Each structure stands twice: as C-alpha cells, then as structure tokens.
Amino acid sequence: MVFIPRAKTYETVNPEYSNYAGEAFGNFQAMLADIPETLGETIPDFHNMEFRLKQLREAVAKDAAGRVSEVKYYLDEIEKRADEMCKAERLYREGKLPKRVCHCDTKVNNMMFDEDGKVLCVIDLDTVMPSFVFSDYGDFLRTG
C-alpha cells in the first residue's frame, strides 16, 4: 500500500471539485476501456436490476416486518417501471448493450484530492468489475 502525503477525501464537494471528480472517473473509464468484460465479478449481480427486483419481490411476499402495506404506493410505482428498469439486462443478453469494466461505487469519497482540489487517484477498487457505464455515471451523480 502506498501512502500519499497531504491527500484528502471528502464526503461532499463544491462544483469545481465535482468537475475534477467527474473528469477523473471519465479518465478511469477510458483507461480500463480495453480490459475485456471477462474480468470476474467481485459482487455477483451487484447492479443486476432483474436480480434486485426478484429480491424485492421475495421480501415483499414475506413481509417479515409487517410494513408492506405502509409502502404499497411505492412498491406499485416500482412495479409500473419494472420492465423499463430491466431493459439494460435484456439489451445485454441480446448483444445490443456491452458491459465494460466499471468502478461500481463511483462516489466522491472514493477518490483522493490534493490541496488544490485536483484528483490524485481513484480508490476503493474492491468493486471494480463488469457493469454498465451508465450505472457508474448515475452512481456518481447521486453523490457528486
């Protein structure tokens, strides 16, 4: 492990630092673009929406905490969108959407900044595996 002196991490950043962070994740994607999708999955089905919906439906059917009725509206909204939410996996199976090596946890606190707010490196690489690039992009927008 390498120690990087004066490096900082942040939970939230200003727009300028966010810009640097977005550029760094873009560079990260570009550097990994030629690595084949055959890289192993570190967390199977981590970003697989079909799998996640199946898990949700199983949890709803069990209603272990007895609260499903309290969130029925939200569950109905999810079901209305389920087909669209699973579109990426279908397109992938049809050979119409590729998977690329992605970070899969793209958030601003998974990079180290210098004193001027420039990104030194992307960290927390335990989730690097094949996924959809737009998942990394969306994950970063959620936190950036």
Enumerate the predicted regions with their spans.
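A conserved long alpha-helix in the C-terminal portion of kinase-like catalytic domains
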Residues: 117-120, 144
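Active-site activation/catalytic loop segments of kinase-like enzymes and analogous catalytic loops
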Residues: 134-144
